[in-house]
Structure formats: structure tokens, C-alpha cells
Design a protein with these regions (language model features):
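A general structural-boundary detector
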Residues: 26-27, 76
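Phosphate-handling DNA/RNA-contact segment within nucleic-acid enzymes
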Residues: 1-26, 34, 38, 60-61
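Aromatic-enriched hydrophobic runs in primary sequence
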Residues: 15-19, 31, 37, 53, ...
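TOPRIM fold recognition
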Residues: 2, 42-43, 48, 54, ...
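Short, contiguous, helix-prone interaction/anchoring segments in small proteins
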Residues: 27-49
Length: 144
């Protein structure tokens, strides 16, 4: 029997695998800060991450990603600042380059039942389970 927290942790793991798949196809993930990047890496994310705070404002960020021409997956936080940034960036990206239409952000909210507001909290929420999941997956492949 899987407990609710373990179920969410498993969904988060699948979410990370999905992001990895998108990035192998050329997408880039955008997060707000360095802690968000660290949390994704802790959970096994291997693709390219753009940290919004490393840019000097929305215009510089959008200019950079639009020149790049790659699909952008916005995973900014769900707090007031993150929602405002997401809205402004989304409006500008709509005109300039491909993006995920906030699919992954909506999926993030749905899978966590709205309990996790910041990407950086993902690793705190499910890291112990994710480590067990990875160990289990590795052991089961070794048996086959």
C-alpha cells in the first residue's frame, strides 16, 4: 500500500523523468532561483536549467530564450512574485518563441495537490522516497 506522500513523491519522480525527456528533445527549463535549480538536480533532473535571477530582468531573459529558439518550460514558483513573473514572461514568450503553454506548471500543481508552492521544496518533500525509488529501480533492473 502506497501512502499519499509516497504517491506524490512517485508522481514527482515521473515528472522529473518527463522533464528529462523534454530536454533530450531540445527544451530548456526555467526556474526562479539557484535553490530551485539545486532541488531539480537533487531529484535527478539532467537537462539545461535557466535561472531567471541570473538575468537582469524579464526583457533580458526573454531576449535570451527567444534567440535560443528552443522550447521553454516555465517552472517558476507559485508565490505572488512567481505568478507575476510567469504571467509577464508568458505574454512575451507567446510572441517570440515556442514554450510549453504552462503544461508542466499546471501538472506540478495538480500532482502536489497545490501543497508545494516553490520548486525548491520538491526535494524536501520527496527526496527520501526518491532515493528508495531509484535504489529499487536499479536493483530490479539488476535482477532481470
Amino acid at each position: 500500500m502506497i501512502h499519499k506522500r509516497d504517491e506524490i513523491a512517485l508522481k514527482i519522480r515521473e515528472f522529473i523523468e518527463s522533464l528529462n525527456h523534454e530536454c533530450k528533445a531540445g527544451a530548456v527549463v526555467a526556474v526562479e532561483g539557484k535553490k530551485d535549480e539545486i532541488a531539480l538536480r537533487d531529484l535527478g533532473f539532467q537537462g539545461e536549467i535557466l535561472v531567471y535571477n541570473n538575468f537582469k530582468g524579464i526583457t533580458n531573459f526573454v531576449d535570451y530564450v527567444s534567440r535560443n529558439g528552443r522550447k521553454v518550460i516555465l517552472l517558476l514558483d507559485r508565490d505572488k512574485k512567481g505568478r507575476t513573473l510567469t504571467s509577464k514572461i508568458f505574454k512575451k514568450l507567446n510572441l517570440l518563441c515556442p514554450h510549453d503553454g504552462l503544461y508542466y506548471k499546471k501538472r506540478f500543481v495538480k500532482m502536489t495537490h497545490g501543497k508545494i508552492m516553490c520548486v525548491e521544496n520538491l526535494s524536501n518533500y520527496c527526496l527520501p522516497f526518491a532515493e528508495n525509488y531509484t535504489k529499487f529501480a536499479f536493483e530490479s533492473k539488476a535482477v532481470i
